[in-house]
Amino acid sequence: MRLVTTPRVAFLRQVADDVLARIGRGRVIVAIDGPVRSGKTQLADDLADVLRERDLAVFRASSEDFHRSREAQAAYGPDTAERYWRYGIDESLLDRTLVDPFRMAGSTAFVTRAFDLVRDAWVEPKWVTGPADAILVLDGRFLLRERLRDQWDVAIAVDGEPTDAADRLAYAASDPREVAAIVIDQSDPEHPRRAGAR
């Protein structure tokens, strides 16, 4: 289905061209990182829609849906920004149930959501499969941290200064804008623009 052409959609079509020029066939993961309230989830949703416009198999997920429960996080110490930055997302769960099985292709099933952050509760997993050629658009804070960034085929960062304490810790350790292939300025969400690229 063709999307209505707006300045945002036209820009994201250019981003999609760039993404597709950087990848080959098979299973591909595009990761979008950025500070809290930067619009990364909406960007991921919109980019996925633009990629689907080209009749590509596209899946969406957010690292927010792979959190540790508050009880599990408490095992790592008091509720601080550092604890959240280090242990808020269950990276092992993300890998085991989404990233690794998605990469395996074939009939291997994966889940795009495992945890409800608002309810602080696990969700019933919905296992899905996809074709051999498919794109996963994954958004979330801290995805371009050093220990995760090599898992992604294309890394996108939303431009913006961190205002949250956990984001400030993450950016002090590794600014996602410095390692992303594509950096997007969404200060005007209806008229996003490139802020940089590698």
Per-region residue spans from a language model:
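Conserved glycine(s) of the Walker
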Residues: G39
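Extreme N-terminal, non-catalytic leader segments
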Residues: M1-V30
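P-loop (Walker A) phosphate-binding loop of NTP-binding proteins
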Residues: P35
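Conserved nucleotide-sensing/catalytic segment adjacent to the nucleotide-binding pocket
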Residues: F59-S62, R68-R119, I135
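Active-site signature of alpha/beta-hydrolase-fold catalytic machinery across serine-
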Residues: D46
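Hydrophobic positions on the alpha1 helix immediately C-terminal to the Walker A/P-loop
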Residues: L43
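Conserved NTP phosphate-binding and transfer environment spanning the P-loop NTPase/kinase superfamily
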Residues: R2-L12, F142-R198
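Post-Walker A helix-loop "phosphate-sensing" segment adjacent to the P-loop in P-loop NTPases
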Residues: D49-F59
